[in-house]
Curated annotation (Swiss-Prot):
Keyword Manganese: no
Protein name: Probable cytosolic iron-sulfur protein assembly protein 1
Family to which the UniProt record says this protein belongs: Belongs to the WD repeat CIA1 family.
Annotated S-S bridges: none
Source taxon at top rank: Eukaryota
Ranges of compositional bias, category Acidic residues: 132-142
Species of provenance: Aspergillus clavatus (strain ATCC 1007 / CBS 513.65 / DSM 816 / NCTC 3887 / NRRL 1 / QM 1276 / 107)
Length: 453
């Protein structure tokens, strides 16, 4: 019998005004208290997380629904947004972040991205009306979004876009079964160069997501597979094809680099980090088969780990493509069954390690991983110890449990997307690093939720 939820989801606010048409996805800015929402009305709506009001409407760049968007990381002085549309194009938008000072501020907003992120957040909160009524300035705000460049290459609807950790590479995927990787030349002229086109998927590619610390890309597809891609000697190629889902894989997301399960004592947390250092961050996926699954990379042999140079041990360049680039990924666990219909999005919090999933049943589900003892009652959902655990110590056992659910979160409508964001409104507890959940649905609405544990 499933355990009773131990946390509570509560509606904090709707983002207003909502779109009058279906909304697909909401992307929180990496350093500022704003989000961008993609809509079927061909626009992207930018909302404040300080007062939950519409700040800008980005329009004019696409001829059909805007399906996806992503903020470029590590940009100083401006915000850069990539948008993907059903018109088969990708747009790049820019806007200067010069908004003056604020009384309240959000100096702690940044998540270790840049030294100036706190000042940037404070200026934005003020200029975007943190606690004030600035709606009459919306028209001026709109004009400040500059449509920088249109990336044309896909033959069909663009389903997902994702920036690499450095912000230099942009991955896009499409119904045309291809994945494109573009390099931002950062030359001041908004020039992008096509780095790779990968066509190994045998169906519509639904999602692309970059590893949080490496230039490794994960993709999810209508062909029921997840694939991993890396660059080797200037040539991008597939290094793993993960099979396990019995239906379309809608979404993949990565674990945070320093994520540790809930309730960890210092020594246990250190043991966890040591035993997971070789395999790196895990991957989570969700599917038409109604499951949410976690995958872990098998560590390579120590010699392969040490000799990663394309020049080999001699230091002399080799004209032969090195072997051993393939990776082995295994299913670590399937999370407790909590959805009745297709699961469209799963999001892994980089701050808390919590997982959230949403889908066609209109339900929000939040999961937590915790350390457990070795008794047989907890073995069903436990992760397997790593055979290559550091210093021979076994990996601590964990299990995933559902800690909160919300049925009918958007009334009768399907929920298309969920994301974690840092809380920025006045109700935030002083000194607390709180997170909120942001859900995006077919009703055109975007809702912000708190989770009390």
């Amino acid at each position: 019998m499933a355990a009773e939820p131990t946390a509570r989801l509560s509606l904090l606010s709707d983002l207003t005004p909502p779109s009058l048409e279906r909304t697909w996805l909401t992307a929180p800015h990496p350093t500022l208290p704003i989000v961008a929402t993609c809509s079927s009305d061909k626009t992207v709506r930018v909302y404040s997380l300080t007062n939950f009001r519409l700040l800008s409407t980005i329009s004019g760049g696409h001829k059909r629904s805007v399906r996806t968007c992503a903020w470029k990381p590590h940009v100083k002085g401006e915000s850069v947004l990539a948008t993907g549309s059903f018109d088969a194009t990708v747009g790049i938008w820019r806007r200067w972040d010069s908004y003056g000072q604020t009384e309240r501020g959000a100096a702690d907003w940044g998540v270790g991205d840049s030294a100036g992120s706190g000042t940037q957040a404070k200026g934005l909160a003020d200029g975007y009306g943190a606690g004030g009524d600035e709606e009459n300035e919306n028209e001026d705000e709109d004009e400040e979004w500059r449509f920088a460049v249109l990336l044309d290459g896909h033959d069909s609807e663009v389903k997902s876009v994702s920036w690499s950790p450095s912000g230099m590479l942009l991955a896009t995927c499409s119904r045309d079964k291809s994945i494109w990787i573009w390099e931002d030349l950062d030359d001041g002229d908004n020039n992008f160069e096509t780095v790779a086109v990968m066509q190994e998927h045998q169906g519509d590619v639904k999602c692309v997501a970059w590893h949080p610390a490496e230039d490794c890309l994960a993709s999810a597809s209508y062909d029921d597979t997840i694939r991993l891609w890396r660059e080797d000697l200037d040539d991008w190629g597939q290094v793993a094809c993960i099979k396990g889902h019995q239906g379309t894989v809608w979404c993949v997301d990565w674990e945070g680099v320093d994520s540790v399960p809930c309730g960890a004592a210092a020594d246990l947390a250190e043991q966890w980090r040591a035993t997971h250092a070789l395999s790196g961050p895990r991957l989570v996926s969700c599917s038409d088969d109604r499951t949410v699954r976690i995958w872990r990379r098998q560590p390579k042999e120590p010699r392969a780990q040490q000799n990663t140079s394309p020049f080999g041990s001699s230091g002399i360049p080799s004209i032969i493509r090195p072997t051993g680039t393939d990776e082995t990924w295994e299913e670590e666990c399937t999370l407790p069954q909590a959805h009745d219909l297709s699961v469209y999005t799963v999001a892994w919090s980089k701050r808390t390690g919590l997982l959230a999933s949403v889908g066609a049943d209109g339900r929000i589900v939040v999961y937590a991983e915790r350390f457990v003892g070795g008794d047989s009652a907890t073995q069903a959902m436990e992760t397997e110890p790593s055979a290559d655990a550091a210093e021979g110590a076994p990996a601590p056992s964990t299990e995933w449990t559902v800690i909160a659910t919300m049925d009918g979160a958007h009334d009768i409508y399907e929920i298309n997307h969920v994301a974690w964001a840092k809380r920025a409104d006045r109700g935030k507890a002083e000194g607390e690093d709180e997170e909120v959940l942001v859900t995006t649905a077919d009703d055109g609405g975007v809702k912000v939720w708190t989770i009390a544990r």
